[in-house]
């Protein structure tokens, strides 16, 4: 049995912050899974790229190779709330029975503790 978590993120031209956020999230998840192998976390990322022009989507794809990532393209007018709604809707469309939804700002650094 796994704990299924859909992580919802919106970004706009914050490539470094977004990739750092994801790197910390993956590291914390991996550390948790090592310590709790009987109940690991299955993580999926639903990220709205709201019209980024700084290469955020490519950087995210690069850091997320082999991960369950869904990038939704916004038109630049979603802002945070609209982008989160788009990502949430995409998570719902996946037909996965998520245990939790994690709404995460792209400048959040998840701790290993």
Could you describe each region identified by the protein language model?
Residues 55, 82, 107-113:
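Acidic donor-binding/catalytic loop of UDP-sugar-dependent glycosyltransferases
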Residues 24-41:
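Short, acidic, metal-binding catalytic loop of nucleotide-sugar glycosyltransferases
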Residues 50, 74, 104-106:
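Active-site acidic Asp-centered loop
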Residues 48-58:
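A conserved acidic beta->alpha catalytic loop
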Residues 74-93:
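Glycine-rich, basic loop-to-helix element that forms the pyrophosphate-binding segment
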Residues 5-17, 21, 28, 48:
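A conserved hydrophobic helix/loop-capping motif in glycosyltransferases and polysaccharide synthases
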Residues 97-109:
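Short beta-strand-to-loop acidic/aromatic patch adjacent to the donor-nucleotide binding site
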